[in-house]
Amino acid sequence: VFAFMDAGQVNDGHVIVATNAPRETLMDCSDAEAAALMRAARRIAIAVQAAFAPEGITVLQANRPAGWQTVPHLHLHVLPRHAGDGVELVWPRKEPGIERLRELAARLQP
């Protein structure tokens, strides 16, 4: 795992954390690789909090273009956040009801 400053700097302190191995999505990596990625993200988030004192931190990981992935290499963003920073992540809530939630959960069972 390695980390570097995002060239786009959505907010000061925006860091990318990525796998060394050539993995395209989260589904392509091992449990150990996923755990290493999240451990590194946690360490970076702690450092970002100490260095930039953001009001919050968003950790974002996307898979495939329909999932907002723009670079075909497994990575995540550690993004310092401030009220009114203009960063938005919006999706419609559909409120499907408890029975539909049970049906959806059942599909995930082995």
What are these regions (language model features)?
Residues 1-110:
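HIT superfamily nucleotide-processing domains
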